[in-house]
From Swiss-Prot:
Residue span(s) of domain KID: 31-90
Key words, A-Z: Activator, DNA-binding, Isopeptide bond, Nucleus, Phosphoprotein, Transcription, Transcription regulation, Ubl conjugation
Covalent link Glycyl lysine isopeptide (Lys-Gly) (interchain with G-Cter in SUMO2), residues: K206
Protein name from the UniProt record: Cyclic AMP-dependent transcription factor ATF-1
Function: Binds the cAMP response element (CRE) (consensus: 5'-GTGACGT[AC][AG]-3'), a sequence present in many viral and cellular promoters. Binds to the Tax-responsive element (TRE) of HTLV-I. Mediates PKA-induced stimulation of CRE-reporter genes. Represses the expression of FTH1 and other antioxidant detoxification genes. Triggers cell proliferation and transformation.
Annotated region described as Leucine-zipper, given as residue ranges: 239-260
Modification note: Phosphorylated at Ser-196 by HIPK2 in response to genotoxic stress. This phosphorylation promotes transcription repression of FTH1 and other antioxidant detoxification genes. The CDK3-mediated phosphorylation at Ser-63 promotes its transactivation and transcriptional activities. Phosphorylated at Ser-63 by RPS6KA4 and RPS6KA5 in response to mitogenic or stress stimuli.
Ranges of compositional bias, category Basic and acidic residues: 67-83
Lineage: Eukaryota, Metazoa, Chordata, Craniata, Vertebrata
Residue stretches making up the bZIP domain: 211-269
The species this protein was found in: Mus musculus
Record-linked Gene3D superfamilies: 1.20.5.170
Subcellular location: Nucleus
Length: 269
């Protein structure tokens, strides 16, 4: 009984101390938690502020994607504008002057866009037009016109289409023959090609005239004799030079022989 009474008294004595110590500890814990929360909130506010500053700096600087997007959008807008307004782009037409050629005899030749040839000759009061040659095609499709130079025996140059042949007879007359070709589906584009000059010389007629053959033979003989005389003169000149060289060598040898004889006679004495 006494032991139980002592234990009860000790329990009752210890309870007031525990009640006194409990509120003090809870107050300390509350202060510590409030301090930690304030530090965490301050850290979070600092981190939020720094992230906002970095975001603001990045927002001020334009990104490469934004620049590329703006450029592509401007390009597409320009293409759309060109597609919607095709009347803005107008094609300017230019008139090309007809080319003019001058022959060795002073004659002027102009090629018109419709394929006509205009011949003109210079005079004291300006250029005098002679005639106009028109080249037409019977086919519906426009075929190419090829021109070439033709030179006569007197040195005059003329322009002749490629489908025409100019022949000069022995009497000196010029005759033109046209070569007709059948039109084909695959025709060449219209072009003008200047080829190398073609010399139209009168052919030498082969005759059995003995006088003419004799003159030709004599002319050839004279040329051969002239060449033979020239070669003989060159050969004689070469021989003369060789003789002069040998004479000089002979003189030097004679002088050397004399000196050797003198030396031998002095030694023998």
């Amino acid at each position: 009984m006494e032991d139980s009474h002592k234990s009860n008294t000790t329990e009752t004595a210890s309870q007031p101390g525990s009640t006194v110590a409990g509120p003090h500890v809870s107050q300390i814990v509350h202060q510590v938690s409030s301090l930690s929360e304030s530090e965490e909130s301050q850290d979070s506010s600092d981190s939020i502020g720094s992230s906002q500053k970095a975001h603001g700096i990045l927002a001020r600087r334009p990104s490469y994607r934004k620049i590329l997007k703006d450029l592509s959008s401007e390009d597409t807008r320009g293409r759309k504008g060109e597609g919607e307004n095709p009347s803005i782009s107008a094609i300017t037409s230019m008139s090309v002057p007809a080319p003019i050629y001058q022959t060795s005899s002073g004659q002027y030749i102009a090629i018109a866009p419709n394929g006509a040839l205009q011949l003109a000759s210079p005079s004291t009061d300006g250029v005098q037009a002679l005639q106009t040659l028109t080249m037409t095609n019977s086919s519906s499709t426009q075929q190419g016109t090829i021109l070439q130079y033709a030179q006569t025996s007197d040195g005059q140059q003329i322009l002749v289409p490629s489908n025409q042949v100019v022949v000069q007879t022995a009497s000196g007359d010029m005759q033109t023959y046209q070569i007709r070709t059948t039109p084909s589906a695959t025709s060449l584009p219209q072009t003008v090609v200047m080829t190398s000059p073609v010399t139209l010389a009168s052919q030498t007629t082969k005759t059995d005239d003995p006088q003419l053959r004799r003159e030709i033979r004599l002319m050839k003989n004279r040329e051969a004799a002239r060449e033979c005389r020239r070669k003989k003169k060159e050969y004689v000149k070469c021989l003369e030079n060789r003789v002069a060289v040998l004479e000089n060598q002979n003189k030097t040898l004679i002088e050397e022989l004399k000196t050797l004889k003198d030396l031998y006679s002095h030694k023998s004495v």
